[in-house]
Amino acid sequence: MNVPRGWLAALGSVLLVSAAQLGMRWGMSRLPLPEAWAGQTPEHAALLAVALAVAAYAASLLCWLAALRHLPLGRAYSLLSASYALVYLLAASLPAFEETFTTGKTLGVGLVVLGVLTVNARRTAAAPAHHPSRKAL
């Protein structure tokens, strides 16, 4: 286990999945409903945003797999929750999304962040490099 590499991979996953969420929201809000696709020409920038968001999801998955290789599942999984806070902050801050900060949402996101910090505050004992139950083939 290489914990710094795991943290870096988890951070990459959080950033990419957050970008994917924002890109998907921006693109889909500018495209017609699926039942109207036959009669309208979709906005190319919106289609590109959705395509890039799908690619960001795929890249996020690769980062997530790397994070799972180097971090305990409980720690890694809690880090994914940081994307909720990041998406909320960016969506409410950037005018393109027309989202607003509210007391309830901010309190909820604050609790999520507090949970992530709590789970990751304690250092855990280093895991063995290999599992004793695994036998060399």
Curated annotation (Swiss-Prot):
GO cellular component terms listed in the entry, alphabetical order: plasma membrane
Molecular function via GO: carbohydrate derivative transmembrane transporter activity
The protein's annotated pathway: Bacterial outer membrane biogenesis; lipopolysaccharide biosynthesis
Membrane topology designation: Multi-pass membrane protein
One BP term from GO: lipid A biosynthetic process
Major subcellular location class: membrane
UniProt name for this protein: Probable 4-amino-4-deoxy-L-arabinose-phosphoundecaprenol flippase subunit ArnF
The encoding gene: arnF
